[in-house]
Amino acid sequence: VRAVAGEFRTSLAIYESCITDFQNVIYRNGAADFEVKPSEMDKVDYSRFSALITAGTVFAGQPSRDATFRAFQNARGAGIPVIFDIDYRPYSWPSAEIASEVLSRAGEESDMIVGNDEEFGFMAGDFKKGLNKARDLASSGNRLIIYKMGEEGAITLYNNEEIRTSIFP
């Protein structure tokens, strides 16, 4: 952990916990986590951990994008799995094209991916193709995928198997 000078700050998120008419407010402008540098990822002793867990928000800008991909390499070198929560937030990215390309790469370099139907659809370039994108990622690399569908439940994909579960109110 290091202090960052200037206008960088800790992010704020406010969520409602209701299924219908869900609202959220996330303030990410100038977030400090976007300032993590690749060289800082080399200072971590990955062998002390069981997994590397990250969210898609850190890929939206530099230098945190390169830093996170460096962390992926270092985790793989230490023999620990990479767990990736897609967490696509369009307002954080310079363009949808860059976001789709970068998040798809992150998915391909991960061992476990968690995302909702909209996020996988976004990565596929078409909402209707989201489940197929999740299936492709699961089958091309022995990945565990959690494909969330809101009040429709979720599908867990692994080793050409699919397990459907409903929500737990």
Predicted features by range, described:
Residues 1-54:
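Conserved N-terminal subdomain of the carbohydrate kinase-like
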Residues 29, 57, 87-91, 118-119, ...:
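Active-site beta-loop-alpha junctions enriched in small/polar residues
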Residues 45-47, 106-107, 139:
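A short, aliphatic-rich alpha-helical micro-motif
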Residues 65-71, 96-104, 126-134:
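Charged helix-capping and loop-helix junction motifs
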Residues 73-77, 126-169:
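Conserved phosphate-binding/catalytic region of the ribokinase-like
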Residues 82-84, 114:
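Hydrophobic beta-strand scaffold residues
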Residues 97-122, 162:
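Structural recognition of alpha->loop->beta junctions
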